[in-house]
Swiss-Prot record:
Keywords: Hydrolase, Lipid A biosynthesis, Lipid biosynthesis, Lipid metabolism, Metal-binding, Zinc. Pathway: Glycolipid biosynthesis; lipid IV(A) biosynthesis; lipid IV(A) from (3R)-3-hydroxytetradecanoyl-[acyl-carrier-protein] and UDP-N-acetyl-alpha-D-glucosamine: step 2/6. Catalyzes the hydrolysis of UDP-3-O-myristoyl-N-acetylglucosamine to form UDP-3-O-myristoylglucosamine and acetate, the committed step in lipid A biosynthesis. It comes from Legionella pneumophila (strain Lens). The gene is lpxC. It catalyses: a UDP-3-O-[(3R)-3-hydroxyacyl]-N-acetyl-alpha-D-glucosamine + H2O = a UDP-3-O-[(3R)-3-hydroxyacyl]-alpha-D-glucosamine + acetate. Belongs to the LpxC family. GO terms for molecular function: metal ion binding; UDP-3-O-acyl-N-acetylglucosamine deacetylase activity. GO terms for biological process: lipid A biosynthetic process. One of its GO terms (cellular component) is membrane. This is UDP-3-O-acyl-N-acetylglucosamine deacetylase.
Length: 304
């Protein structure tokens, strides 16, 4: 049986909010079986809980933002990506601000945080969503789709007419039966164009944005002194984002996802379309009588 997982102990981290520029304290806590991932705004009285669910996504401009009434938590995708990548099913995430800290712009600091807390298996079967039929959402030449697949595979293409991108599309594909999220995906940082960053500053946004937490590109080159961490970092970050956005289904996936020049909005629309099409998916669990999905060994049993 593939079991549910939760952090072994409470652990904290501090960072800066990308848009507020203010210091944020994040606390990761273990949670009982079948809790799911739950964000908590502990700076409010009473504390407001927001489940990590596609139904609570209220804004997808620049990042994925969860809303519960007038309360929000922004930039959840990198942390969710790390939780998904390490197979964490249940956790409480306490924050004292309306956004998750941006850290270095990747999911690697969150992976380190979770690994530092330790991972504990729980006495309940992990739930998966298995894709049974193709589902596709498209708009203005961009698209996202789910396809049936025995394991979990993500393919993404970006395209920018810019010298840094060699004026042509970039594509990567990760099949997680043989790919390590920790080694090959989590270190990819978010990226943006200097011209857009300046416009955001004028709108009182991106106050916490810097070369320390994003790859910044001007009209010709990458401005970060150390350049890229690896050649496919731009498009791999889009895979990282997608993994986080897809985890808002509340379960790990058995299927293939393809994104073409898409972003958080299309990702969320795809989740909503999938849930409506109940003939296109099913919940499944894996025990000794059921076949195991093709997933990387880092998902398999850990020390209790």
């Amino acid at each position: 049986m593939i079991k549910q997982r939760t952090p072994k102990k409470v652990i904290q981290a501090t960072g800066v909010g990308l848009h507020s520029g203010e210091k944020v304290l994040l606390t990761l806590r273990p949670a009982p079986v079948n809790t799911g991932i739950v964000f908590r705004r502990v700076d409010l009285s009473p504390v407001v809980e927001i489940p990590a669910s596609y139904e609570y996504v209220g804004d997808t401009m620049l990042c994925t933002t969860l809303h519960h009434g007038k309360v929000k938590i922004a930039t959840v995708e990198h942390l969710l990506s790390a939780l998904a990548g390490l197979g964490i099913d249940n956790a409480y995430i306490d924050v004292n601000a309306p956004e998750i800290p941006i850290m270095d712009g990747s999911a690697a600091p969150f992976v380190f945080l979770i690994q530092s807390a330790g991972i504990r298996e729980q006495n309940a079967a992990k739930r998966y969503i298995r894709i049974l039929k193709p589902i596709r959402v498209e708009e203005n030449g961009k698209y996202v789709q789910f396809l049936p697949h025995k394991g979990y595979k993500i393919t993404f293409t970006i395209g920018f007419e810019h010298p840094v991108f060699n004026d042509r599309p970039q594509t990567v594909s990760f099949d997680f039966s043989g790919t390590s999220y920790v080694k090959e995906v989590c270190r990819a940082r978010t990226f943006g164009f200097l011209s857009d960053y300046e416009k955001l500053r004028e709108c009182d946004l991106a106050k916490g944005g810097s070369l320390d937490n994003a790859i910044v590109v001007d009209d010709y080159r990458v401005l970060n002194e150390d350049g890229l961490r690896f050649e496919s970092e731009f498009v791999t970050h889009k895979v990282l984002d997608a993994i986080g956005d897809l985890y808002l289904l509340g379960s790990s996936l058995i299927g293939a996802f393809e994104g073409y020049k898409s972003g958080h909005e299309l990702n969320n629309r795809l989740l909503r379309e999938l849930m409506i099409r109940q003939d296109a998916w099913e919940y499944t669990y894996f025990d000794t009588e059921n076949y195991l999905p093709a997933v990387h060994p880092e998902y398999y049993p850990v020390e209790a």
